[in-house]
């Protein structure tokens, strides 16, 4: 019997502000595709500006999934992301369309593409509560430093603001004696799909300028009011509020910094995050990179995907 044909999936990755959204929609139009967000924060309703969520106008009629599926006070795990996205891939494929995953959350995307197994192990609730208490009393950086001591690779990958994942990595080490990064490393070798993995990059200074400009635009669009709405709803120690763009403005509302300092910190954290994203993708995934410093490469990328996945686009003759 012949080998079972794997589902085709195109994946567009890259750092924040590099131009993934427009490219993905152009590709979806050309390739009869539907888009799955690979961003762990665009899942939250009412968190639109700070997550640079794709707008209805930008979607231009292309279906998007994994956007606005949770309330900000709800938690969300990589295991749930994996399950939901794999279901979307099946359903999109069954409709004769091409699933296109777009985003910047490396671990989440990797968990879908590779044969990751997530245990239902409840872990150690007492230890978890101790770490949560430490994070509240001594700050998230203190707990993140504890992770750096036992699992530096996970600490590099997980931002200090993502307290839930930092504590989960500590908990895995505490209960099993094994690093979270080592557990994942063992599972990374088998792709489950026929994948075309595209990465966008650009000159670092240009990218950083774009990030700074994006933050200014977010403030003009009403980021302060968006975060104030969450703050006034009493949303505090939730996973969603650890996101870059929200934590910094929360510091302002809690009188820890001035608004100017909050915006400056947001720009700094966004640039650092972009750098971490690029490091992750380059170290962890077999990506074909396209430099878009001098402008978009839509036609070139389209030809590459057609060849890699043996597809015909609507632009093909």
UniProtKB/Swiss-Prot annotation:
InterPro entries: Dimethylallyltransferase, IPT, P-loop_NTPase. Gene3D superfamilies: 1.10.20.140, P-loop containing nucleotide triphosphate hydrolases. GO terms for molecular function: ATP binding; tRNA dimethylallyltransferase activity. Coiled coil: none annotated. HAMAP family: IPP_trans. Belongs to the IPP transferase family. Substrate binds at residues 16-21. SUPFAM superfamilies: P-loop containing nucleoside triphosphate hydrolases (SSF52540). It catalyses: adenosine(37) in tRNA + dimethylallyl diphosphate = N(6)-dimethylallyladenosine(37) in tRNA + diphosphate. The record marks 105, 128 as: Interaction with substrate tRNA. Pfam families: IPPT (PF01715). This is tRNA dimethylallyltransferase. Its EC number is 2.5.1.75. Its cofactor is Mg(2+). Monomer. Residues 39-42 are annotated as: Interaction with substrate tRNA. The keyword Ribonucleoprotein does not apply.
């Amino acid at each position: 019997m012949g080998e079972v044909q794997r589902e085709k999936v195109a994946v567009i990755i890259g750092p924040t502000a590099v131009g993934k959204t427009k490219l993905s929609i152009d590709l979806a139009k050309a390739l009869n595709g539907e888009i799955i967000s690979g961003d762990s924060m665009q899942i939250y309703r009412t968190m639109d500006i700070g997550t640079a969520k794709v707008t209805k106008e930008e979607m231009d009629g292309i279906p998007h999934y994994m956007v606005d599926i949770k309330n900000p006070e709800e938690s969300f795990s990589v295991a749930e992301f994996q399950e939901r996205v794999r279901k979307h891939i099946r359903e999109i494929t069954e409709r004769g369309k091409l699933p296109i995953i777009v985003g910047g959350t490396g671990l989440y995307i990797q968990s879908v593409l590779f044969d990751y197994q997530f245990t239902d192990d409840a872990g150690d609730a007492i230890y978890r509560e101790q770490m949560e208490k430490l994070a509240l009393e001594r700050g998230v950086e203190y707990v993140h430093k504890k992770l750096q001591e036992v699992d530096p690779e996970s600490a590099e990958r997980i931002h200090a603001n993502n307290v839930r994942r930092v504590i989960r990595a500590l908990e895995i080490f505490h209960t099993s004696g094994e690093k979270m990064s080592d557990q994942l490393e063992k599972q990374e070798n088998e792709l489950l799909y026929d994948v075309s993995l595209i990465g966008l990059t650009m000159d670092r200074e240009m990218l950083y300028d774009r990030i700074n400009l994006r933050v200014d635009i977010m403030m003009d669009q009403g980021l302060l009011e968006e975060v104030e709405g969450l703050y006034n709803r009493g949303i505090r120690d939730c996973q969603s509020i650890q996101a870059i763009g929200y934590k910094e403005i929360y510091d302002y509302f809690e009188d820890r910094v001035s608004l100017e300092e909050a915006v400056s910190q947001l720009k700094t954290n966004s640039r650092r995050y972009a750098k971490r994203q690029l490091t992750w993708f380059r170290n962890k995934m077999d990506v074909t990179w396209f430099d878009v410093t001098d402008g978009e490469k839509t036609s070139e990328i389209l030809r590459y995907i057609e060849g890699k996945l043996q597809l015909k686009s609507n632009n093909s003759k």
